């Protein structure tokens, strides 16, 4: 088994372990983050109905404006601000942060800090 496959399997184990305990309610939906090599995605999900309330990513053209690269820390900061602004527009202030098995470091940490600075609390 190569190193990349081991890392992916370890992330999926962390994801399952955390998802058992973490649920988004109508009062406090779940802010879920996914990161790939080229993009970063964030969505706010209410787990009771299984619906995505708000989403933002570096694939969206409104977030990418003025960015040279979509897979770096600056892009994660832009996505964090965008998701917070959209959430506050829907009167969502409190969320539960789901790092989706990724380590709280780098782009995931930057997205979370940018969302907090823009007004979300978790």
Swiss-Prot record:
One of its GO terms (molecular function) is structural constituent of ribosome. InterPro entries: Ribosomal_uL18_bac-type, Ribosomal_uL18_bac/euk. Keywords: Ribonucleoprotein, Ribosomal protein, RNA-binding, rRNA-binding. Transmembrane segments: none annotated. One of its GO terms (biological process) is translation. The keyword Transcription does not apply. Pfam families: Ribosomal_L18p. One of its GO terms (cellular component) is cytosolic large ribosomal subunit. CDD domains: Ribosomal_L18_L5e. PANTHER family: 39S RIBOSOMAL PROTEIN L18, MITOCHONDRIAL, LARGE RIBOSOMAL SUBUNIT PROTEIN UL18M. This is one of the proteins that bind and probably mediate the attachment of the 5S RNA into the large ribosomal subunit, where it forms part of the central protuberance. Part of the 50S ribosomal subunit; part of the 5S rRNA/L5/L18/L25 subcomplex. Contacts the 5S and 23S rRNAs. Belongs to the universal ribosomal protein uL18 family. This is Large ribosomal subunit protein uL18. It comes from Syntrophotalea carbinolica (strain DSM 2380 / NBRC 103641 / GraBd1) (Pelobacter carbinolicus).
């Amino acid at each position: 088994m190569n190193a990349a496959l081991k890392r992916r399997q370890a992330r999926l184990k962390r994801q399952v372990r955390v998802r058992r305990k973490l649920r988004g309610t109508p009062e406090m939906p779940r802010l879920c983050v996914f990161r790939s090599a080229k993009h970063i995605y964030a969505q706010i999900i209410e787990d009771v109905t299984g619906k995505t309330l708000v989403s933002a990513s570096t694939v969206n053209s409104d977030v990418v404006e003025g960015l040279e690269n979509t897979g770096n820390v600056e892009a994660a900061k832009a996505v964090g601000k965008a998701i917070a602004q959209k959430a506050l527009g829907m009167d969502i202030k409190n969320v539960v942060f789901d790092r989706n098995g990724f380590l709280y470091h780098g782009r995931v940490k930057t997205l979370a800090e940018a969302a907090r600075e823009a007004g979300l609390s978790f």
